[in-house]
Amino acid sequence: LIVKSLRESFGEFADITALGTNSAATAAMMKAKANRGATGENAIVWNSGRVDVITGPVSVVLANGMLGEVTPKMAEALSSSRAEKLLLPLNQELLTMVGLKKEPLPHLIDELVNLMKEKYHVRS
């Protein structure tokens, strides 16, 4: 959903690299029109320092997040990256983000897209 919303909002202006923990996730992001995609720990670690923005659920920066799909190396690379991180507070782990009100996923993605529009000075 994130890639689809970014592509719809930014068109070809956005250069989207889809990095998935598994091939199904990468394939879904490629279907949503990411420019390129790669799968697995090495791809995520290697590319995390080569992007401007990292998006996804907050669990991508938690070792063993997403039911164990996020390895400690992935979490470290993503959280240590100099890229700006726009993470969605999806509470699939035993983690509660205090102070945030629960919103449906489409609303969270809309907010993420709007933040990126502000950052990159894109008008709707």
Task: Tell where the protein language model's regions lie, with residue ranges.
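A cross-family phosphate/adenosyl-ligand binding-site feature
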Residues: 1-56, 61-124
